[in-house]
Amino acid sequence: MEGGGRGPNQTILSEIEHMPEAPRQRISHHRRARSETFFSGESIDDLLLFDPSDIDFSSLDFLNAPPPPQQSQQQPQASPMSVDSEETSSNGVVPPNSLPPKPEARFGRHVRSFSVDSDFFDDLGVTEEKFIATSSGEKKKGNHHHSRSNSMDGEMSSASFNIESILASVSGKDSGKKNMGMGGDRLAELALLDPKRAKRILANRQSAARSKERKIRYTGELERKVQTLQNEATTLSAQVTMLQRGTSELNTENKHLKMRLQALEQQAELRDALNEALRDELNRLKVVAGEIPQGNGNSYNRAQFSSQQSAMNQFGNKTNQQMSTNGQPSLPSYMDFTKRG
């Protein structure tokens, strides 16, 4: 039991002794890949005016770098350290395979990967196969470099994007016009450098054109509706004017009818008053006629009665003439009333 307890401690101590005193320092620093800053926002204007013919490929260090040595034999894989293994618990000796191998220092610089921006170098006519040279001066294919990955950047002739269609759409629609801050020539150059961005710009332009067409159609429909409403308002205003004229005419006629009615009422009142006056006079005459005693055959009495009767007839004729001159209908004379009485 004691030997099994000391085994793991001895293993840990032996690992600590084999550890280096200071961490390994890399001689060469890591170069930042051009694919990370190739299409930055600050230098996009310079990239659009980029001329591939100005590149000096002889000055590139990754083309003249010697190939790394190839390992002929594979290193034996280190067996994982097990604290609870039977060998360490029983013997207390650390097996040689359980020690981690020392890291080997690697001398060399980071080579830029062609997988991220290989489309750009394909347009320039530069591939990694042409610039991998051996010591004898012969050019041959290197097997130790990173191969191009179609999953990251795709081919230029893939179905997702077609530069020819972009160039045709640019030359057909937007030639001579500047939309979204970029002309057709610069967009064509951008299509060669960054196809995805050019495709996105074209999609935005098409979407803006469609929205503009929808806006124009909607504005035209609104204008037609406004014109229709204006015509209806004009027709209704004419009808309202006609109705107002009819109403004013009816009001005038109503006033005339009211005036005629008032005149008729006044005439009726005058007739009633005249009838009352005649009736009172008739009653008075009846009373007077009843109070006169009958004569004894004297001619004086008859002459007096005839003179009174002629005076009454003259009074009735005068009243009839006055009524006819005023436009009132003629009324029966007092003689008629006396005869009827």
UniProtKB/Swiss-Prot annotation:
Tissue expr: Mostly expressed in dividing cells, present in leaves, roots and seedlings.
Subcellular location: Cytoplasm; Nucleus
GO BP annotation list: cellular response to sulfate starvation; defense response; DNA-mediated transformation; import into nucleus; negative regulation of cell differentiation; osmosensory signaling pathway; response to osmotic stress; thigmotropism
Region Leucine-zipper: start-end pairs: 222-257
Compositionally biased intervals (Polar residues): 307-331
UniProt-listed InterPro entries: bZIP, bZIP_RF2, bZIP_sf
One GO CC term on file: cytosol
Low complexity bias (residue ranges): 71-80
Record's compositionally biased regions (Basic and acidic residues): 15-24
Region (Disordered): 1-33, 59-106, 135-156, 307-341
Modified residues (Phosphoserine): S79
Span(s) of short sequence motif Nuclear localization signal: 198-205
Modification comment: Phosphorylated by MPK3. This phosphorylation promotes nuclear localization.
Function, as annotated: Transcription activator that binds specifically to the VIP1 response elements (VREs) DNA sequence 5'-ACNGCT-3' found in some stress genes (e.g. TRX8 and MYB44), when phosphorylated/activated by MPK3. Required for Agrobacterium VirE2 nuclear import and tumorigenicity. Promotes transient expression of T-DNA in early stages by interacting with VirE2 in complex with the T-DNA and facilitating its translocation to the nucleus, and mediates stable genetic transformation by Agrobacterium by binding H2A histone. Prevents cell differentiation and shoot formation.
Family: Belongs to the bZIP family.
Name used for this protein in its record: Transcription factor VIP1
Name of the coding gene: VIP1
